[in-house]
């Protein structure tokens, strides 16, 4: 008999809670995503996260301890050697990653692009982080006139290649992306995903077509999600979760346009009758505010998210468990534009916790979440991680 019929796992992308013990190795001494945002905002207003025990993990401006938190609380340390989205999420589901994925806030190295040009016979333009629509406005006409390839990246570990379908036929674009995929498996580059981004139209009126194709990496081993799916449990992936795991172990995928859309979708899954895992990633914190070093926007987004939690609390049943965490930090007042190596919060709540919660021991790996989910549903335990299921008292 499962202790919980449904587990709702929410990853607040990049919401770190202070430098990790090994932060110095990553150039991240002093990083503190929530703490610095709270300072910048002169106090964060997150009453619902506070009720769950956020301030009991650590007090910050506007975020204080409560005498009787509703849930269990602690923080988790990442064991893997990266600080990117894929590494964090893969570890959450029971894997240990010793080769970090790379992000390219300054664009890709010249030697990689030289090799790509040589192997494809086409010049490369762009080579910077950009929004897909903006880069077409900027370089689409040049791409059409010259037959070159627009290469760009984003805040994540991706290499995207855009070309007009009438200039570079789809088959050729896909071949080019396969070449890029091979080149970027090298540990120096280690790109999580290569994406073909074909477009059509005329200058000033370009549109991306549905012929996008992703060349992703599958997780380097079986995750708890694979075990759940193979045991006929539901695994509902919301937001970019399905992409992060390349669809592995996913039974249903719900795309989202924003954090608020993500919260709408999680409320939708709360209304569904299923047995298994609902897994949500809220990417806006990271993509719109962390990388752009916008502490004000980040703080407002955190408060907006917090204001949606009562809808979740209201619909949670006695045999549901809500787990809230993050996958890495991205301190918007830290130098540079990259993620930061931080502890992440962990909050666990169920309406069945009548006595409220208490502090859990510090987690030595994000994989403790995967182990807890696996133990709850009686599936094969991951190689890494220690379950805290029995510490959650009803």
Curated annotation (Swiss-Prot):
By its UniProt entry, which InterPro entries does this protein fall under? Alkaline_phosphatase_core_sf, DeoB, Metalloenzyme, Phosphopentomutase_DeoB_cap_sf
**Known Pfam families for this protein?**
Metalloenzyme
Free-text remark on how the cofactor is bound: Binds 2 manganese ions.
Q: Which UniProt keywords apply?
A: Cytoplasm, Isomerase, Manganese, Metal-binding
The listed locations are: Cytoplasm
The record's EC number reads 5.4.2.7
Q: Which residues are noted in the entry as Mn(2+) 1-binding?
A: 13, 327-328
Which of this chain's residues are annotated to bind Mn(2+) 2?
286, 291, 339
**Superkingdom of origin:** Bacteria
- Catalysed conversion reaction: 2-deoxy-alpha-D-ribose 1-phosphate = 2-deoxy-D-ribose 5-phosphate; alpha-D-ribose 1-phosphate = D-ribose 5-phosphate
SUPFAM superfamilies this protein is in? Alkaline phosphatase-like, DeoB insert domain-like
> Does the keyword section mention Isomerase?
yes
What metabolic or biological pathway is this protein involved in?
Answer: Carbohydrate degradation; 2-deoxy-D-ribose 1-phosphate degradation; D-glyceraldehyde 3-phosphate and acetaldehyde from 2-deoxy-alpha-D-ribose 1-phosphate: step 1/2
Q: Which cofactor does it need?
A: Mn(2+)
Which Gene Ontology cellular component terms are annotated?
cytosol
Any one of the GO BP annotations? 5-phosphoribose 1-diphosphate biosynthetic process
Q: Which GO terms describe its molecular function?
A: magnesium ion binding; manganese ion binding; phosphopentomutase activity
HAMAP family in alphabetical order: Phosphopentomut (MF_00740)
Q: Which family does it belong to?
A: Belongs to the phosphopentomutase family.
Give a short account of what the protein does: Isomerase that catalyzes the conversion of deoxy-ribose 1-phosphate (dRib-1-P) and ribose 1-phosphate (Rib-1-P) to deoxy-ribose 5-phosphate (dRib-5-P) and ribose 5-phosphate (Rib-5-P), respectively.
Q: What is this protein called?
A: Phosphopentomutase
Species lineage: Bacteria, Bacillati, Bacillota, Bacilli, Bacillales
Please state the gene responsible for encoding this protein.
deoB
């Amino acid at each position: 008999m499962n202790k919980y019929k449904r587990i709702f796992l929410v990853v607040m992308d990049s919401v770190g809670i202070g430098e990790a013990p090994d932060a110095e190795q990553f150039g991240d001494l002093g990083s503190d995503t929530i703490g610095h945002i709270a300072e910048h905002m002169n106090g964060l207003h997150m009453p619902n996260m506070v009720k769950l025990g956020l301030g009991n993990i650590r007090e910050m401006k506007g975020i204080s301890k409560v005498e009787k938190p509703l849930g269990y609380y602690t923080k988790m340390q990442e064991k893997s050697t990266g600080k990117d989205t894929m590494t964090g999420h893969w570890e959450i589901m029971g894997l240990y990653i010793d080769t970090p994925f790379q992000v390219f806030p300054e664009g890709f190295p010249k030697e990689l692009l030289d090799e790509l040009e040589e192997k494809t016979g086409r010049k490369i333009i762009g080579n910077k982080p950009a929004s897909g629509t903006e880069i077409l406005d900027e370089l689409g006409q040049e791409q059409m006139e010259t037959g070159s390839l627009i290469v760009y990246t984003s805040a994540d570990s991706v290499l995207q290649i855009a070309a007009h379908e009438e200039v570079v036929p789809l088959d050729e674009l896909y071949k080019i992306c396969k070449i890029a995929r091979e080149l970027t498996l090298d540990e120096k580059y280690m790109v999580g995903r290569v994406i073909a981004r074909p477009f059509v139209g005329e200058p000033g009126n370009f549109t991306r077509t549905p012929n996008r194709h992703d060349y992703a990496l599958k997780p380097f081993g079986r995750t708890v999600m694979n075990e759940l799916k193979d045991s006929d449990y539901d695994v509902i992936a919301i937001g970019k979760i399905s992409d992060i795991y390349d669809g592995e172990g996913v039974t249903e995928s719900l795309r989202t346009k924003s954090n608020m859309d993500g919260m709408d979708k999680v409320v939708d899954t709360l209304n569904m009758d299923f047995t298994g895992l609902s897994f949500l990633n809220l990417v806006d914190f990271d993509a719109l505010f962390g990388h752009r070093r916008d502490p004000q926007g980040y703080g407002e987004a955190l408060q907006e998210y917090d204001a949606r939690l009562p809808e979740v609390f209201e619909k949670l049943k006695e045999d549901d468990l809500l787990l809230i965490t993050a996958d890495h930090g991205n301190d918007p007042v830290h130098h540079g534009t990259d993620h930061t190596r931080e502890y992440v919060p962990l909050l666990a709540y169920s309406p069945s916790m009548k006595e409220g919660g208490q502090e859990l021991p510090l987690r030595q790996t994000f994989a403790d979440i995967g182990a807890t989910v696996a133990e709850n549903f009686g599936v094969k335990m991951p190689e890494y991680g220690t379950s805290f299921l029995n510490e959650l008292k009803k």
